[in-house]
Amino acid sequence: MTFSLFGDKFTRHSGITLLMEDLNDGLRTPGAIMLGGGNPAQIPEMQDYFQTLLTDMLESGKATDALCNYDGPQGKTELLTLLAGMLREKLGWDIEPQNIALTNGSQSAFFYLFNLFAGRRADGRVKKVLFPLAPEYIGYADAGLEEDLFVSARPNIELLPEGQFKYHVDFEHLHIGEETGMICVSRPTNPTGNVITDEELLKLDALANQHGIPLVIDNAYGVPFPGIIFSEARPLWNPNIVLCMSLSKLGLPGSRCGIIIANEKIITAITNMNGIISLAPGGIGPAMMCEMIKRNDLLRLSETVIKPFYYQRVQETIAIIRRYLPENRCLIHKPEGAIFLWLWFKDLPITTKQLYQRLKARGVLMVPGHNFFPGLDKPWPHTHQCMRMNYVPEPEKIEAGVKILAEEIERAWAESH
């Protein structure tokens, strides 16, 4: 039995499948310290809220309705209307229900978008996806139907006090040409916790407009929900921007509900793709979200429960790291949002891929940084000096993991002398 080219491409071992397998193995391995995956925190107050909400929905028959009926291929009409109204009212955006489509998780939204705007055209030209600020999300790297669909730009690195640093878009060397089909940024960024500034975003928007290509913003952690963002950042949308959101980081990753906000032409295309690939998006997540909007809970919980929880967790985690790893051993990307810390082990004598294997052997899972630079034009040592860690677990788990990390860093340095 042999596979097609499509089959060959999508059965290869990719960074994202490896990550998900490690996550799964770790969840089943007693004592494993999971600092690798992207699972959001199970915040007690949110768990209680969802429990009550689902109980109410069962009693009123709304849960049964959502599970026993198909929604349309654009997604639940009631949610499209409620969400458009909320965004118009709260952010002043000129949005109607026909500017929104739902997908089965934002991972599938990106698969649709990358292959809509990049790849082979009718005239034979091949367009690419430009990531103007690498490192960028691991799950993008293999989502193209064509090979080599992605181009990443190296960032400028700003060194900050207290052993922190921040990546910025290097506009001076940013190349947008005939071959660029779309620009894509996550804000806040998974893996680094970086939030590109309002000024950088407006500049990217202007460049995208100038070249007649869309700017796609992955807003999985951003404002107005789930609000896991700790710096001042103004949400941006206009008809040339495709904004992607999700219910996962509210604490509902199992609902697999992605949200795309775009101009009507793009929404029509996404709706058609939904119909062909999955008939319709799942209904239970959207039904829950409808209730959350109607009860005025969606933005309230994002602001008063979710954001403060993660902010406290990230501060605790940085304090733990600094107890074991001084600035000369480990720099930390300024944590401006998302659920990860990005650690830079400058001049480390081993690669972070080797470090990952050593940590894994000791029951600690983190993600090596080289996976987050898809399509860099030339090798860059920095890509092998960074690791992503999830700061969501309990502080005692974080401490146990960081202690082992520090031991392995010291061991690597000792071996090099």
UniProtKB/Swiss-Prot annotation:
Family matches, as CDD domains: AAT_like
Any one biological process term the GO annotation gives: alpha-amino acid metabolic process
EC category name: transferase
Cofactor(s) the protein requires to work: pyridoxal 5'-phosphate
Presence of keyword Cytoplasm: yes
List of residues that carry N6-(pyridoxal phosphate)lysine: 249
Highest rank taxon of the organism: Bacteria
Transferase as UniProt keyword: yes
GO-annotated cellular components: cytosol
Reactions it catalyzes: L-valine + pyruvate = 3-methyl-2-oxobutanoate + L-alanine
This protein's UniProt keywords: Aminotransferase, Cytoplasm, Pyridoxal phosphate, Transferase
One Gene Ontology MF term: pyridoxal phosphate binding
Cited function: Involved in the biosynthesis of alanine.
Family membership noted in the UniProt record: Belongs to the class-I pyridoxal-phosphate-dependent aminotransferase family.
Subunit description: Homodimer.
Protein name as catalogued: Valine--pyruvate aminotransferase
Organism: Escherichia coli (strain K12)
